[in-house]
Amino acid sequence: NYFYAIKITGVFDKIDTRSPEKHEKPYPSLLEILKTQSIFNYENSKGTIVGFFSPEYTQGVGVGGFHLHYISDDRTQGGHVFNFDIKNATVEVSKPLNFKLELPQSEEYKAVSINLKTLHKEVHKAESSR
């Protein structure tokens, strides 16, 4: 029922990531972005995973479960993590006592229509696809 901040450092035997292309307005849907994302499979990569574990009840505010990103020490490899193997790692975990959500105050944000059904489907597909 808690949020956790996570940091994992070491040499990853294997790490699989993905990264979307840069997009301009009008922004495509998350499902459209997934069609053109790049998939990366790295081996023996030294670097750091950072991310969060969010409780399932926060789905919609965040992504329930683990949401992790990777960057190699030399800054040439990275992306959203969906799989990794590591033998020796330093793992750091923090349990924040507070959660603050700050919403944009722009006119554009005020006017946007968010379809929750579509949003939940897109997030589920994005987090479960490779």
Predicted features and spans:
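Long, positively charged binding patches that form subdomain-scale interaction surfaces
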Residues: 1-61
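A broad, low-specificity signal marking well-ordered, structured residues that form hydrophobic/aromatic
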Residues: 4, 47, 66, 79, ...
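Residues in well-ordered beta-strands of folded domains
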Residues: 7-9, 18, 50-53, 69, ...
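Short, solvent-exposed amphipathic alpha-helical segments in soluble enzyme
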Residues: 22-24, 67, 85-86
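Mature extracellular or lumenal effector domains of secreted proteins
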Residues: 47, 56, 76-77, 88, ...
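Histidine-centered divalent-metal-coordination microenvironment in nucleic-acid enzymes
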Residues: 63-71
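A hydrophobic, small-residue-rich beta->alpha segment in the mid-to-C-terminal subdomain
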Residues: 72-114
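Mature, function-bearing regions of proteins
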Residues: 113, 122-130
